[in-house]
C-alpha cells in the first residue's frame, strides 16, 4: 500500500523542474546516486562515497555537491557510535536509530571537526548540517555555544554551509548576529506538508499552521541566508502552491516521495 502511495504522489505531485534545481538524497544507495546527472544542488551523505565518487558526480554535471553531516545527534549505525553513547542526552522521537547528543562536549566537537575535514578532502562543495534542533530540546547556554563552536570549526573548511531545520537555534543566532558569514543557507522541512509517521504517509499541512515557518523563513531571507524548502509527497495542486511561494520569495524547493530521502521518484 505504501509503495502505491509513493507512485501516485510522484505522478501527481513532483515537477521535473524541482528535480534538477535541488535534490536531497541522503538516503540513496551509492550505486544509484552515482548515476545522478544535471542537478544544480545535490545533497548526499558523502561519508559513504569516495573522492573518486564525488569527482564522478561532478563529471555527471551535478554542479554543487553538499554532504550531510549530523551535528546534533548520534546515529547507532555510525562506526563510532559506541565511543559517544555516553554523552547522549535522550531519545529522538520518530527516529529509533538516533539520540540527541551533548554538543558542548569537547570530544563531540572534535569528532565533527575531524569529519568535516575528511569530507572536505573528498571534494564536496558544502555541508548540509542536521539536528541543530538539539537546542530546541535542550535550551541551555552550553548547548547554544556548543553549536556555535562547531559551526566556527566547520567554517575553517571554507565550504558553503546549509543548516537543516534548527529554527530555534538559528533565530537566536541571528538575533545575536553570531552566524553572519558562517552559515549561508537554511533548509526547512514540512512548511506546506506533514509526515504521518504512524502510517508512513504524507498530507497537506493546514494553512493556519504554515505561518510560523513562513515568518521564520522571511527573517532568514532578510538576514541574508539562502532559503530551501524540503517537502514530502505533495499533490499536483499543492506543488503549484509551493512553487509559486518559492518563486515569489526567491526560494528553492525539493519535493521528496520518501521520508528516507532515498529515491527521485
Predicted regions and their residues:
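Glycan-processing catalytic domains of CAZymes
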Residues: 17-265
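Membrane-interface motif at the C-terminal end of an N-terminal transmembrane signal
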Residues: 12-15
Amino acid at each position: 500500500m505504501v509503495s502505491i502511495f509513493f507512485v501516485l504522489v510522484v505522478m501527481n505531485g513532483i515537477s521535473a523542474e524541482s528535480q534538477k534545481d535541488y535534490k536531497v538524497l541522503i538516503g540513496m544507495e551509492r550505486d544509484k546516486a552515482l548515476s545522478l546527472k544535471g542537478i544544480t544542488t545535490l545533497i548526499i551523505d558523502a561519508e559513504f562515497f569516495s573522492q573518486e565518487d564525488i569527482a564522478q558526480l561532478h563529471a555527471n554535471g551535478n554542479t554543487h555537491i553538499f554532504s550531510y553531516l549530523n551535528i546534533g545527534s548520534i546515529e547507532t549505525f555510525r562506526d563510532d557510535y559506541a565511543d559517544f553513547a555516553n554523552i547522549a542526552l535522550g531519545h529522538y522521537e520518530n527516529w529509533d536509530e538516533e539520540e540527541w547528543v551533548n554538543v558542548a562536549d569537547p570530544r563531540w566537537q572534535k569528532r565533527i571537526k575531524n569529519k568535516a575535514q575528511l569530507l572536505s578532502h573528498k571534494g564536496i562543495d558544502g555541508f548540509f548540517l542536521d539536528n541543530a534542533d538539539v537546542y530546541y530540546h535542550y535550551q541551555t547556554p552550553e548547548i547554544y555555544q556548543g553549536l556555535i563552536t562547531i559551526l566556527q570549526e566547520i567554517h575553517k573548511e571554507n565550504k558553503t554551509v546549509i543548516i537543516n531545520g534548527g529554527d530555534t537555534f538559528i533565530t537566536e543566532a541571528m538575533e545575536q548576529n553570531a552566524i553572519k558569514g558562517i552559515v549561508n543557507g537554511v533548509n526547512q522541512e514540512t512548511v506546506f506538508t506533514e509526515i504521518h509517521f504512524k502510517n508512513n504517509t504524507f498530507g497537506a499541512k493546514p494553512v493556519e499552521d504554515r505561518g510560523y515557518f513562513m515568518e521564520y523563513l522571511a527573517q532568514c531571507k532578510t538576514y541574508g541566508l539562502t532559503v530551501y524548502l524540503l517537502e514530502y509527497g505533495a499533490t499536483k495542486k499543492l506543488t503549484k502552491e509551493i512553487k509559486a511561494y518559492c518563486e515569489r520569495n526567491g526560494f528553492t524547493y525539493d519535493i521528496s516521495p520518501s521520508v528516507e530521502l532515498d529515491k527521485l521518484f
